[in-house]
């Protein structure tokens, strides 16, 4: 057998790519310097993979921003507004992901969506009537050549044509079938050029095959691949899937003239069953056996038991998905060895793949023995009191009374807010000063008293500023928080925190998911101090800001020894205690963010309710079920596709929900109207993930579009997400325009 991985993290061991790219954005280094730094980083990563004994090394899994955006740029699926900018290729590329506002023009960023059921986000290209699909880029060739010059014959990786079409947007009057021939021709041109350069095999990532497929989608897939594989230009083709099984197309897949097929044996419920039913002897099977999404050590005995059942003759061991979704290495962590031994980040997963290959080939007995010993030892005990509390929950604990309509009237009288009330999602910019003070406090260089004084002063400034520009519902800004999950986890039992466990989320932004190690309980009040302080500084309502249980779970590395449902209920009870403490402290509007609710929704619709929504939605209701009727519960959701789960979202029984809508052209509003959505809504009126400031009239037009779909009495005006990562000048300018636009819209009601 041989070994490989689907892809490797790209930010770098210490997020070098992030920091270098941000210097470029700030014009502190040149384009040439950025490209040189990226080239050095790629070489370092390839060398790591090689030294770990992995026999097939991928290339083009690196990206300056997003691999899906790379494919759009490669195939010229770029809007005319960006094509026409008098900028370099790299500047136009970044304009697609971040937007551009400068002397050369003003364009918005392309939409951003969750990458399947992960916390990674991809940039969504749009096929327009005048889109001319053709080979227009050279990144895939450049990186293959770079590796070749280092003595490595890599396997280039590229988003497959079916997934590329499935996950892209289309202008009205345009459909995927219109681009099949031109896209196939462009892919074949890539094949030909790679073959010319000396490549022998290409990896086409077709993750969209693990979803429910209609007859039309299957027909599109087969049409694409029958045409594409008719002339492979001398290359071998690996069709790689991940995040689930390919039950809808397996029979067709194994009969295609591909040379290799990659399947997920970790998340693919039916993968083993499908393969045991037969796999062609003339194809190589890439077995995704090491989990690319979680950080726990692989149980070698369990993996070997799966491998023994696979009838395929030609096997390559690989990760279940790209290692992009886990941190770089445990080598820089400071956990006790007894803890650290249980974790495998990207570099350690290379060891696991190599170990499994060696054991299967009659070697690696020491590695197997050590692994057996690790899994034979009990890792963590149970919290009996917590388990009893969960066992005692009944239907009443998940139901808030009175019903929404009655609460809505009570809250209208209690708060007396104007029509189209204005608010923000929660966080304000975390400046260098804020981060420096937090670091100094952590290092003991700043006393508790000094740090508290700084936070109080900062909160005072922003409360006053919000009052000055006449926001209706204020926020305290979350200056004390490093991360919306880690901050809570630090006050919960059962959590561990890595020092350098960064994972890419979107663009150059990384998140550092905490690790759920054991049973979760609240250790002490978490947010009451600063939320109640902020409320004491104003007569206007200030929102208490919490992260919801489903998001805390989904943005953590979950346990594998108990179900995610049970872990979520534990977290829900901890957050419930916090909600009640906030309410008792006089905070009457409480936002419980469920930014990641959609994230772990199963990819197959048939699994949505039984496997997820039937416990995730009640877990949210459990958190707020016992608050008073005049306490208003808000929730917020980030970049996701919600249109297909609108009834479930309404069933969360929040009083107000805010969500991203600006980048996706308010598409969700039609569905809210169609489903008679009851919860009050705050569709984001401008995109905070781009540094551009909305133009004069831009927010006014967005509000007008919202009011055409949603009754004004149901509408709140807010940005589409928190403002932590933005700069102060752009934030203030944008929010002033938001308040002005809301007031102007009120005048027209």
Curated annotation (Swiss-Prot):
- EC nos: 2.1.1.14
Query: Coiled-coil annotation: which residues?
Result: none
User: What is the organism field in this record?
Assistant: Streptococcus pneumoniae serotype 19F (strain G54)
In this chain, Zn(2+) is annotated as bound at 636, 638, 660, 721
Q: Write the record's keywords in alphabetical order, separated by commas.
A: Amino-acid biosynthesis, Metal-binding, Methionine biosynthesis, Methyltransferase, Repeat, Transferase, Zinc
Q: What is this protein called?
A: 5-methyltetrahydropteroyltriglutamate--homocysteine methyltransferase
Note accompanying the cofactor annotation: Binds 1 zinc ion per subunit.
Q: Which InterPro entries match?
A: Cbl-indep_Met_Synth_N, Cobalamin-indep_Met_synthase, Met_Synth_C/arc, UROD/MetE-like_sf
């Amino acid at each position: 057998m041989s070994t490989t991985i689907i892809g490797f993290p790209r930010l770098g061991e210490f997020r070098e790519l992030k920091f270098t790219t941000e210097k470029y954005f700030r014009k502190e280094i040149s384009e040439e310097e950025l490209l040189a730094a990226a080239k050095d980083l790629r070489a370092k990563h390839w060398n790591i993979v090689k030294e770990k004994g992995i026999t097939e090394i991928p290339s083009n899994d690196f990206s300056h921003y997003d691999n899906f955006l790379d494919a759009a740029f490669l195939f010229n699926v770029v809007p005319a507004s960006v094509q026409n900018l008098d900028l370099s290729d790299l500047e136009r590329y970044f304009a697609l992901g971040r937007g551009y506002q400068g002397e050369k023009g003003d364009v918005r960023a392309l939409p951003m969506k969750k990458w399947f059921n992960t916390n990674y986000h991809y940039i969504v290209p749009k096929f327009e009537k005048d889109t001319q699909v053709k080979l227009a880029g050279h990144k895939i060739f450049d990186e293959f050549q770079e590796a070749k010059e280092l003595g490595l014959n890599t396997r280039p990786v590229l988003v497959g044509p079916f997934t590329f079409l499935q996950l892209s947007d289309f202008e009205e009057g345009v459909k995927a079938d219109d681009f099949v021939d031109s896209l196939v021709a462009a892919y074949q041109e890539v094949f030909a050029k790679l073959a010319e350069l000396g490549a022998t095999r290409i990896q086409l990532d077709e993750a969209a095959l693990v979803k429910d497929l209609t007859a039309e989608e299957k027909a599109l897939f087969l049409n694409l691949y029958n045409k594409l594989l008719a002339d492979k230009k001398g290359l071998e083709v690996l069709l790689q899937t991940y995040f689930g099984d390919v039950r809808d197309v397996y029979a067709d897949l194994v009969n295609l003239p591909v040379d290799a097929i990659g399947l997920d044996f970790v998340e693919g419920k039916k993968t083993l069953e499908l393969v045991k039913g037969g796999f062609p002897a003339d194809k190589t099977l890439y077995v995704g056996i090491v989990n690319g999404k979680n950080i726990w050590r692989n149980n070698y005995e369990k993996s070997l038991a799966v491998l023994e059942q696979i009838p395929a003759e030609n096997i390559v061991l690989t990760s279940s998905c790209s290692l992009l979704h886990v941190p770089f290495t445990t080598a820089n962590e400071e956990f006790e060895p007894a803890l650290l031994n249980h974790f495998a980040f990207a570099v350690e997963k290379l060891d696991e793949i190599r170990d499994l290959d060696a054991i299967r080939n009659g070697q690696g007995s020491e590695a197997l023995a050590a692994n057996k010993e690790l899994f034979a030892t009990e890792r963590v005990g149970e919290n009996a009191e917590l388990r009893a509390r969960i066992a005692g929950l009944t239907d009443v604990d998940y139901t808030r009374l009175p019903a929404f309509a009655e609460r809505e009237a009570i809250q209208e009288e209690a708060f007396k807010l104007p029509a189209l009330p204005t608010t923000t999602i929660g966080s304000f910019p975390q400046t260098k000063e804020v981060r420096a003070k937090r670091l100094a406090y952590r290092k003991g260089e700043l006393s508790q008293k000094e740090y508290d004084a700084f936070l109080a002063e900062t909160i005072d400034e922003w409360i006053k500023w919000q009052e000055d520009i006449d926001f209706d519902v204020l926020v305290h800004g979350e200056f004390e928080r490093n991360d919306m999950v880690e901050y809570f986890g630090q006050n919960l039992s059962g959590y561990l925190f890595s020092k350098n466990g960064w994972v890419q989320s979107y663009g150059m932004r990384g998140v550092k998911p905490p690790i759920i190690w054991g049973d979760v309980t609240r250790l002490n009040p978490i947010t009451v101090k600063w939320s109640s302080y902020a409320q004491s500084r104003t007569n206007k309502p200030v929102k208490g800001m919490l992260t919801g249980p489903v998001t805390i779970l989904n943005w953590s590395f979950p346990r594998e020894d108990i179900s995610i449902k049970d872990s979520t209920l534990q977290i829900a009870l901890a957050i419930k205690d916090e909600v009640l403490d906030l309410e008792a402290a006089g905070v009457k509007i409480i936002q419980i963010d469920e930014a990641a609710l959609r994230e772990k929704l199963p990819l197959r619709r048939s699994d949505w309710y039984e496997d997820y929504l039937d416990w995730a939605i009640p877990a949210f209701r459990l958190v707020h079920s016992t608050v008073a009727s005049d306490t208003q519960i808000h929730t917020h959701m980030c970049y996701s596709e919600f249109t297909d789960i609108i009834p479930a979202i309404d069933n969360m029984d929040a009083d107000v929900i805010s969500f991203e809508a600006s980048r996706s052209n308010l598409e969700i509003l039609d569905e809210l109207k169609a489903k008679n959505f009851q919860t009050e809504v705050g569709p984001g009126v401008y995109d905070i993930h781009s540094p551009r400031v909305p133009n004069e009239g831009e927010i006014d037009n967005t509000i007008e579009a919202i009011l055409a779909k949603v009754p004004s009495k149901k509408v709140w005006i807010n940005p589409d997400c928190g403002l932590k990562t933005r700069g102060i000048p752009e934030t203030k300018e944008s929010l002033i325009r938001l308040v002005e636009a809301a007031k102007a819209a009120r005048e027209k009601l």
